[in-house]
């Protein structure tokens, strides 16, 4: 009921609106508008024919009439109603580079504004001769729409076709120049027509003099050369009485205060009467200001005596960068012209603006008179409004008098910043990966290092994330010095003292680096040591992170924010909510990924969430909830000279209320009008300028779905997850550019590395769209709800590229998990919908599976109106989703004989995979592939080039699509294919990206061409300059085969990307792919648990008793024969998925069902679980069955904790030499038996001198970066050379006979967990992996290394009290630990029985009550109260499966996590912690290179 009431309040709020700063009342939100569907008949075909003979087929959605004209392209991302009504397109057939057109339908084309001008259009109707698009949205949705685009075109008798490869057309025009063309329908032949021979200006100009703004004080004559309506609006708005005159009107004798010439189409030289009239003005004594726009610039230049020329491909779009020559300011402009002025300006005139990219003239000015003109459109619509100020300058000229020039009235630019002189820069990384802060910072940090090295600046990198690429110590792209240390003020201060950097970069290390930098600033450390923060200042960072300062800053510029209060207590939070009214949203200051945030429908929820939030921060913001509004993001770049560009705008498919990290996101935005797009863009730039951001930042908006009302949600003054997504979506290297800007380099001087020719001062155009979908692993966390909200829960994400929404969307869904077919009503991983499913609740309460609930609702014939009401998802997206399911229904009615080429092609165009189609047709995937290829249906390879094909690309950043007609690249490299890791998830994270990058770099160093396939936008491996060809694509059998055969690759490396590519080994091998390294057949034998165990028996290699089971009875019988506990393991899984230690018959039933669901095609193996054993990892490289490189590390924890969650020690600390020799011997036998050539990992149990094999993975493991960096030998470099048959120098490798064992240091790898984000999850370690990241540190001994590693995970050394809760069986071993902690001065608290035992053994302890018994004994304090008031700042909780206080222990653990208190749940880790605290009172700041230098010195 509470949820229903909350939903009702949200809807009521959305309908009636509430008070925002500077927001006017708006119309009520109508949940949907009816889309107009075309008649269900076959679309009429037509062709676009070019004068060079090119002929392309398409389908009509406009008027079915043939037409001829000049074919041009526009690279703008929005505003098609404004674009097609621009008079400058008269006589032209317009090609839209934006692939999806018609999303918002058409506005009321009869509506007029207060001036009598068309309200939403730029003229009195459509001016293009024809329209060419790739994909047309037959179903539209926008609150201003009254009809479809197709209907409008038909009304005005304008032909339009879709299904055209518009990128191919653009490239033809780019390479051959603008050319004539025609849209032809069957039976309607037309001849080519050259509109440039016609006086198009005369055709679009008014025939009569018209007056607008009558009675206004300033008289402006506007010469209509095809003037846009918005020019007139802007003039009248500034107080002009506008006299609009025909192009050939003699205005030379008219009285006016200023004259404006604007338009227009065609060849300006044909407008001779106008040129003569302007010449008279220029040569007369009249000095009233003259302002020319677009054609007005050309006419003014011709009248002055200059010449014009026809451009080869014209400048038409919304992202053209121009530079003001007089003050070096750069602007992004909208343009639409095919002619330009040459360099023949006479004396007295000079250029005013120049195009940054092609150096063409963009404006002229008279040196002594008030005459000026610009080639671009400052009045825009569609496009950016950055240069609208020129209208103000024009009016300033009028007011100032006649004897002045334009330069005297232009806005004064910000002072030009000088280059920042630094010689050494400290870059702070983000530390280990956690939810909300993942691999995107490895990518951004790596880019920053590269940028610094290009500018000859030395770099010191501080980051304990040993699995990251950026922490490599050797390589051309690496930092000069790397510190594996905690990112805390204490350690950073020590590094500053030692390294003496003069610059500091905070924006590349996420919230960790930002918060640390702010604290260093507050402590005065940066000032004391003379360290400059590069890029955005700390003051600006604080203004975005402190919620009150942020609110105050926005109010200074009257920007729109939700009503809010920054508070520092729960009491004040409750008061704020009462003032604002529920529901409210709370947000934490200095927090990441929405941590500490949530929607509070009532007082109780607010108390609960604010209590948890204040455990992490000292300030929260209580604001009005805007749940249900659209969430829009902009990535903004600003340099120190105040040049600004918005690199990407993104739209969350999920509405406000779901954290953007957990939302499906598309780029560019798909449901915004030009007015909405530009309003938010302009606001973004205003805010970024006001806050003083220098570099890159992300700004998030809530936009009302049926009005222009918006509010700013937050600004991230750093690189973020969205930044990485925007970089990969556009090809614009944001982190690299931001790092250059931090050095004071202005944007116009930075090259666009993709084109190699153009400037980085531009806004990318996309002729494709991308979809990002999060990857969750919530099933792994017992007790965690699948519901998602304002606090992020996803552990990774994928990004798919397509040319239709459906294609991009379905690809992205499949990328998330191999079990996902696409957009279907079926749940992933073979799960079933519950029999009591409440579908409406599933839709109204966002969850990790809601997208499938939407599919089910559509499949169940729920109306889209109802789905929209329940989800707040824009109906345009729902229309597209419905189209996918309609196609599935169509396919299910067909078979291989009845399937037509057209239907199969359409299915592929909207993202259906072969596997998906095969299930509909009742075929195998191989049969569907054969059917498709027989019909000659294959994908096309397209480039991402940042400029929608306007300029050639020098990089090979690629994707695959069925929406095309040609490839963008050739395929003569025959490179080596390397498969990446796919989305980050539990068990597969940045360590596998490190492996892939290491392999790629080795291949390139050996002179091999590389072809990389991956779909993860957070990775370094998807940085296009890491390889020769990057395919941002699915890691599926179908797509890998497509690419492999198209490229004719020399082979495929599958062993460096984790389990996803490893699982493809056998299917790829069976389809003729040459798998490099270990045979796929051997991989299959090792992955199948039963076969592998049988091989070990043959080899006489010891393992625990085992049995492959297929039924519950077999499992129960085995358990009975060996006694519980048993270990249950499925095959072909990563990170212990569905792996469990089973202690009882009930658990066996439960866990066996889960394991068989996860691994349906392979048996489940049961082994006897050996208690009290230590686990040992063997990471190795084999060559033809011989081990040539190895490292042995030891787990701190006893067996039972997944290796990914274990704390690793290298070298081993407690393992006997005899046991190590047995480990080596078993490894030797396994390598030989499986003929291993490449990387592999074997896990062992060691108890005393007994050694048992657990499992073997014939691929790289997650510990490869750790052992490689610790030993100074890149295991993947060695493995790659082995796999491709290169010679390997074994003399310096750690072979089994000659190991490399560090003598002067110990390395500790510690796991990173994200328990605070996983509400209600039990933070205890099991066989199934739960950690999200890892860190590693080094010390002279185990204790200093361990403390550094623990501190790097965010662990805080306790200062006050420690709560001890241990199960009775731990007591004998724990007494010494308790004594050590007491002797170190900690006050000990313990549950009653444990307290009695400690006191009886002379260890003072204060008894406390179990949570379930609180209040029963007044003399016992409440554990939860002691934790929350800070009396306890460490919790040690050591339960086992036999404890009767299961729930109480869970409550204690959860309370600690929710209160931000460190928690230890493993005895061995607790013991090591107590020893470390006792023995390492002061932790040094030495890192790996210090110990290496010491070892080298000793050796010398």
UniProtKB/Swiss-Prot annotation:
Binding site for N-acetyl-L-glutamate: 1391, 1394, 1410, 1437, 1440, 1449
Effect of residue 1376 to S: No functional consequences; no negative effect on protein stability, enzyme activity and thermal stability
Residue ranges constituting the Glutamine amidotransferase type-1 domain according to the UniProt record: 219-404
Keywords: Acetylation, Allosteric enzyme, ATP-binding, Cell membrane, Disease variant, Glycoprotein, Ligase, Membrane, Mitochondrion, Nucleotide-binding, Nucleus, Phosphoprotein, Repeat, Transit peptide, Urea cycle
Encoding gene per record: CPS1
Known function: Involved in the urea cycle of ureotelic animals where the enzyme plays an important role in removing excess ammonia from the cell.
Protein name per Swiss-Prot or TrEMBL: Carbamoyl-phosphate synthase [ammonia], mitochondrial
Effect of residue 174 to W: In CPS1D; uncertain significance
Subunit structure: Can form homooligomers (monomers as predominant form and dimers).
Post-translational modification: Undergoes proteolytic cleavage in the C-terminal region corresponding to the loss of approximately 12 AA residues from the C-terminus.
ATP-grasp domain boundaries: 551-743, 1093-1284
Modified residues (N6-succinyllysine): 55, 57, 119, 157, 207, 214, 287, 307, 400, 402, 412, 458, 522, 527, 553, 560, 575, 612, 751, 757, 793, 831, 875, 889, 892, 915, 919, 1074, 1100, 1149, 1168, 1183, 1232, 1269, 1291, 1356, 1360, 1444, 1471, 1479, 1486
Anthranilate phosphoribosyltransferase homolog, as annotated region: 39-218
Transit peptide: 1-38
Membrane protein topology class: Peripheral membrane protein
